[in-house]
Amino acid sequence: GLGANIFSSAYGEVVEVTEDRIIIKPDEEQKDEFVPIEEGSKLDMVKAAGVVGMGGAGFPTGVKLGTDLEGGYILINAAECEPGLRHNIQQIEEECVKVIRGVKYSMEISNAAKAIFAIKKKNTKAVQTLKEALKDEPAISIHLLPDIYPMGEERAVVRECLGIEL
């Protein structure tokens, strides 16, 4: 199915499972160590870690990455559709090397030949940071989006970057 592994930060006993939560009675003694993810392929490790998308559906990232793109491309939606949000832009400005490393892993796992960052023109610092970080990455490009709302919506991003109507 489309499920994903779920982890807890507390050792204990599961005492109740409801539609929207899992109740754990914590052990009196909590261990400091964590249970490591078993070594394996990058895709297997993403699946084992229970990584999910940040959208409301929590779609399993392993399912997305498990698609063989056969030399296709990945779109990175950094448009920040909602006017008050800045988390994507902040990640690019502060952790650009890690973001690009994640994109390269995603390309490797999914067999993508190219990746495109979709980002609004108004985010000049993030755009400049990306340009500098990508100067030696010919397979990863930047597509500047217009500064209009709701330009972060996925169909609008696909239309703007690829000229495809979904």
Label each PLM-derived region with a short phrase.
Residues G1, I6-E16:
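Generic structural motif
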Residues T18-A49:
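Glycine- and charge-enriched low-complexity intrinsically disordered segments
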Residues K47-V51, G56, A79-E80, K104-A112, ...:
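Generic secondary-structure signature for well-ordered alpha-helical cores
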Residues A57-G71:
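Short amphipathic alpha-helices and their capping/turn segments at secondary-structure boundaries
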Residues I74-N88:
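Gly-rich Lys/Arg/Thr-decorated short loops/hinges at beta-loop-alpha junctions or inter-strand turns
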Residues E93-I109:
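Histidine-anchored nucleotide/phosphate-binding helix
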Residues A113-L166:
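Hydrophobic alpha-helical positions that pack around
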